A protein has these predicted regions:
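Soluble periplasmic/extracytoplasmic beta-strand elements of cell-envelope proteins
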Residues: 31-36, 157-163, 170-172
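Transmembrane alpha-helices and immediately adjacent membrane-cytoplasm interface residues
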Residues: 66, 70, 90-124
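Juxtamembrane "helix exit" motif at the C-terminal ends of alpha-helical transmembrane segments
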Residues: 56-80
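Canonical alpha-helical transmembrane segment with a positive-inside/aromatic-interface signature
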Residues: 115-158, 173-180
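Cytosol-/stroma-facing membrane-proximal "stalk/adaptor" domains immediately downstream
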Residues: 184-237
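Short, charged cytosolic
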Residues: 8-33
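Perimembrane loop-to-helix junctions flanking transmembrane segments
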Residues: 73-94
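Flexible, solvent-exposed short loops/turns enriched in glycine
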Residues: 3-4, 166-201
């Protein structure tokens, strides 16, 4: 069963993450936040496309079998394997009927769509890589502003965004961060974190990513004497 965002970390791992963020922010004015979501979008078009393809495929199989059996019966052959014709496709094609195939597609479409909606991971094969990447990035940007992570004094907040369905990690820095740290650096950490999550090292890989973020932030944004903790340290859901 697919793990949910609310169940990704154990209570102990949640505590370790909070401690890791506090430690990472000890020597920097930068702020680290982490957010986990079940998915970045509902991907309704994948439900539609997937249901259409699957219903069409299975309807084709059923119609082909039905047409071939009709051909066997009309020719007076037996129904056993001994009666299997070498001209299977031609026999089936001659007896296939569009007027039964299309209604069958229509009837099967809705059960398949319901099935895909209940098991979101089935949507992934019907999505392009670009669609997934852009969606996760846009959801991360939206979350950054929805959760008001941009409201740090020196614009030094970063968001570690994890989208479980897509198996994607996106690290987003505020304007102050991006002025000094290249986005490629965050991409490397995101890739390492994604690999750790795939290996089911959830808490450990997140804590390691937070630590690396803190080290880089401390080099460019040393802690100020009047610095305060501006963002919550708990995992955002």
């Amino acid at each position: 069963m697919k793990i949910k965002a609310s169940e990704l970390f154990s209570p102990e791992e949640n505590k370790d993450i909070v401690d890791s963020i506090k430690k990472a922010e000890t020597n920097t004015s930068g702020e680290v936040a982490i957010m986990v979501v079940d998915s970045s979008d509902s991907y309704r078009e994948a439900e539609t496309l997937g249901a259409f393809i699957l219903s069409g495929f299975f309807s084709l199989i059923l119609e082909t079998v039905k047409a071939y059996l009709t051909a066997l019966k009309a020719a007076g052959w037996g129904y056993g394997l001994s009666g299997f014709s070498a001209h299977f496709l031609s026999e089936a094609a001659a007896n296939a009927a569009v007027w039964t195939y299309i209604p069958m597609v229509f009837v099967l479409y809705f059960p398949f769509r319901f099935l895909i909606s209940k098991f979101p991971e089935m949507k992934i094969p019907f999505l392009s890589g670009n669609r997934i990447e852009e969606t996760v990035r846009e959801r991360a940007v939206m979350a950054f502003y929805e959760k008001q992570l941009y409201k740090t004094r020196d614009e030094t907040g970063i968001l570690i965004f994890i989208s479980l369905l897509e198996h994607r990690v996106w690290i987003l820095g505020d304007r102050g961060i991006n002025a000094k740290i290249a986005p490629d650096f965050w991409g490397i950490i995101a890739s390492e974190l994604s690999s750790g999550i795939k290996e089911k090292q959830y808490g450990k890989s997140v804590c390691l990513a937070i630590s690396k973020c803190g080290e880089e932030l401390s080099r460019h944004f040393p802690k100020k004497s009047d610095d305060t903790n501006e963002l919550a340290d708990e995992v955002i859901l």
